[in-house]
């Protein structure tokens, strides 16, 4: 969507971009000179979409001068996150308890949902951490609780970790330091030798011994800012 592609649409409450691969919003794609709406417009788009820094501009010009409108006055709703929420194969999970999770048929559904969740972008995951699947739980929170019940997820302090259903991908996120306790957690200890891919989704610190016995490790996908204690090599040789 190019410059001034969507201009002065002050009465439009919902915008749907249905390209399954995402959309590119250029600078000034949305322009509201003197006519920013009194509500927050909903913008539905795939999380792979690319938004220019000034994709919505002229928000505080003319009659709107001094109103302090920003792009936060739009609701960005990611369609791939919504597709996960509406997936019929996963609908029973949102009313399931920990005891139900251990039933073989249910555990299989949880594993499939975990794999689907892991494949989502960070933006889509963030939406699932906010959207409610019932009156108290978010979709991400409920799924993680069920995954813990069958040994596919856990916590060490402020670090959360999950392992894929095939046991080959270990994902860690959170804040603070990943300690040697990681290698000593029972379910990790039993599976760590099969981990081929390590995904580090947040800028944590990895302490010596945290990745002990990860002898099959082939790839590490880490965000910028991950640190290691003392600058030492914490990865297995």
Regions found by a protein language model. Give the residues of each.
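Short loop/beta submotifs within extracellular cysteine-rich repeat domains
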Residues: 12, 119-129, 179, 217-219
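Beta-rich interaction/scaffold domains
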Residues: 80-151
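A composition-driven surface/loop motif
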Residues: 32, 54, 111-116, 156, ...
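N-terminal segments that cap or nucleate solenoid repeat domains
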Residues: 102, 109, 151-191
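Structural signature of tandem-repeat unit edges
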Residues: 1, 9-24, 38-51, 167-175, ...
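Periodic small-residue-enriched repeat registers in elongated scaffold domains
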Residues: 5-9, 29-30, 210, 234-235
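Short, charged/polar "capping" segments at the starts of alpha-helices
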Residues: 22-26, 48-58, 124-127
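Extracellular/surface-exposed low-complexity segments
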Residues: 34-89, 148-156
């Amino acid at each position: 969507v190019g410059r001034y592609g969507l201009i002065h649409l002050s009465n439009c409450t919902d915008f749907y971009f249905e390209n399954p691969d995402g959309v590119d919003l250029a600078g000034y794609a949305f322009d509201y000179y003197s006519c920013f709406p009194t509500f927050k417009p909903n913008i539905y788009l795939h999380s792979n979409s690319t938004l220019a820094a000034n994709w919505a501009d002229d928000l505080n010009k003319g009659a709107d001068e001094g109103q302090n409108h920003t792009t936060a006055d739009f609701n960005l709703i990611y369609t791939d996150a919504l597709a996960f929420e509406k997936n019929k194969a996963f609908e029973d999970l949102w009313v399931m308890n920990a005891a139900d999770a251990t039933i073989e048929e249910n555990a299989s559904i949880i594993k499939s949902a975990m794999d689907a969740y892991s494949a989502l972008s960070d933006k889509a995951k963030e939406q699932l951490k906010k959207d409610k699947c019932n009156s108290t739980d978010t979709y991400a929170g409920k799924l993680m609780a069920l995954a813990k019940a069958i040994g596919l997820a856990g916590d060490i302090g402020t670090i959360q970790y999950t392992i894929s259903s095939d046991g080959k991908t270990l994902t860690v996120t959170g804040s603070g330091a990943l300690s040697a306790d990681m290698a000593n957690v029972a379910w990790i200890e039993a599976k760590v030798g099969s981990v081929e891919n390590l995904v580090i989704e947040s800028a944590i610190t990895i302490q010596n011994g945290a990745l002990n016995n990860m002898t099959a490790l082939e790839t590490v996908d880490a965000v910028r800012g991950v640190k290691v204690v003392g600058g030492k090599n914490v990865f297995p040789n």
